[in-house]
């Protein structure tokens, strides 16, 4: 069994029992590692060094700043479970993927960087409502994941351009052309 000794001073348990005051007085840093049967058993610490360690622990336990963050920042509300229809069902307007949809999509081999936008979900629901097909909830989520993968990759991963924006002329001259 390997172990790490955290002090250069090592003494056998018999020597410590025989004259503990002298052993601790000679210890560098007020700490000595005590061995029994050629293995570290415990550390012996002087009262002064113990007081230093306790003061250091108390100092580290106090916050380094007087700014306190509100606890509600750390407490995320539990998502209320959504009633998912059992078995196969046709797409309906209020359908939502599970809260851990991005994780599930990754398990299905679809890496999504961002969550589903409301526009993407609305488009998906509208398309499949018109189709009238029935699938299980997990199958709908898989279809949504594939739809997002294809839709987002169609433009090289870039967001779609707004067709209403007016383009601005480029005044740079490409290399190799005279201006």
UniProtKB/Swiss-Prot annotation:
Positions of region (Disordered): 156-179
GO molecular function: identical protein binding; magnesium ion binding; single-stranded DNA binding
TM region positions: none
Function description: Involved in the restart of stalled replication forks, which reloads the DnaB replicative helicase on sites other than the origin of replication. Functions in the PriA-PriB and PriA-PriC restart pathways, but probably not in the PriC-Rep pathway. Displaces ssDNA from a PriB-ssDNA complex. Also involved in inducing stable DNA replication during SOS response. It forms, in concert with DnaC protein and other prepriming proteins DnaB, PriA, PriB and PriC a prepriming protein complex on the specific site of the template DNA recognized by PriA.
Region span, N-terminus (NT) dissociates a PriB-ssDNA complex, involved in trimerization: 1-88
Species assigned in the record: Escherichia coli (strain K12)
Originating gene: dnaT
One Pfam family, short name: DnaT
Lineage: Bacteria, Pseudomonadati, Pseudomonadota, Gammaproteobacteria, Enterobacterales
Result after altering residue 137 to A: Decreased ssDNA binding
Family named by the database record: Belongs to the DnaT family.
UniProt keyword annotations, A-Z: DNA replication, DNA-binding, Primosome
Descriptive protein name: Replication restart protein DnaT
GO terms classed as biological process: DNA replication, synthesis of primer; DNA-templated DNA replication; protein homotrimerization; replication fork processing
Miscellaneous comment text of the record: There are about 50 molecules per cell. At this concentration it should exist in a 3:1 monomer:trimer state.
UniProt domain comment: The N-terminus (NT, residues 1-88) dissociates PriB from ssDNA, but a smaller region (residues 1-69) does not. The NT is also involved in trimerization. The C-terminus (CT, residues 99-154) is involved in ssDNA binding and forms a 3-helix bundle with a long flexible tail (residues 155-179). Both domains are required for cooperative ssDNA-binding. The CT is also involved in trimerization.
Binding site for ssDNA: 124, 127-128, 133, 143, 146
GO cellular component, one term: DnaB-DnaC-DnaT-PriA-PriC complex
Annotated consequence of substituting residue 66 to A: In the residue 1-88 fragment, strongly decreased dissociation of PriB-ssDNA
Gene3D superfamilies: 1.10.8.1180
InterPro entries: DnaT, DnaT_DNA_bind
